[in-house]
Amino acid sequence: MNIENSGVAVERPGRRVRRRTDGDVATCVRVLADVHRRDGYPVNWPDRPDAWLSQSCAWGAWVAELGGRVVGHVGLSRGGEGDLAPGVWSDRNGTNKDLTAVVSRLFVAPQARGHGIGALLIGRAVAEARGRGLHPVLDVVESDTAAAALYERLGWELMATVEQRWSPSQLVAVHCYAAAS
């Protein structure tokens, strides 16, 4: 991974991040399916993965390209009903949770890992959040140790681990992270 002294991944020839277009969604769904088969993300495969990708991206969605191919995705939005990190951040800081932006729907194709793509995507979402005057936060299931390791390498702080009921029979431990101030 190419990281500048500031700890921020930078674009290099052959890899870049750009705004997602409607034409990218089908490719993103295929990449997400590969990620799901390999890593189990998302934990519960959505009935409509195209809609799932878009529902948490109200403020923007970006794709990463490696060698001209879409290999990753990230979204940014205001916290929703199932997002725990905004409330945890708000409680810790004594501020309104509306001052947060949720980084979500982050994934990188298995064959594209090790090139700094995840860091580039997170960096783009963080820049957008900060440009809006908001603090970036995210939730990740406790079992996704690779994602947690990435966030921590990038300086994100684990605020809490909480139990979240996803269905009457599914209770999941979720880590709540906040970007460094």
Language-model segments: what does each one mean?
Residues 2-10, 138, 157, 162-181:
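Terminal substrate-recognition subdomain of acyl/acetyltransferases
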Residues 14-30:
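A short beta-loop-alpha structural element at the N-terminal edge
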Residues 37-70, 75:
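Active-site rim helix/loop that mediates acceptor-substrate recognition in acyltransferases
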Residues 62, 72-74, 101, 106, ...:
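Conserved GNAT-family N-acetyltransferase fold
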Residues 75-105, 165-170:
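Conserved acyl-donor/pantetheine-binding loop and adjacent beta-alpha core of acyl/acetyltransferases
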Residues 108, 114-127, 149-153:
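Conserved acetyl-CoA-binding loop-helix of GNAT-fold acetyltransferases
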Residues 119, 131, 143-160, 167-170:
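Conserved active-site alpha-helix within GNAT-family acetyltransferase domains
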Residues 129-141:
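Conserved GNAT acetyl-CoA-binding A-motif
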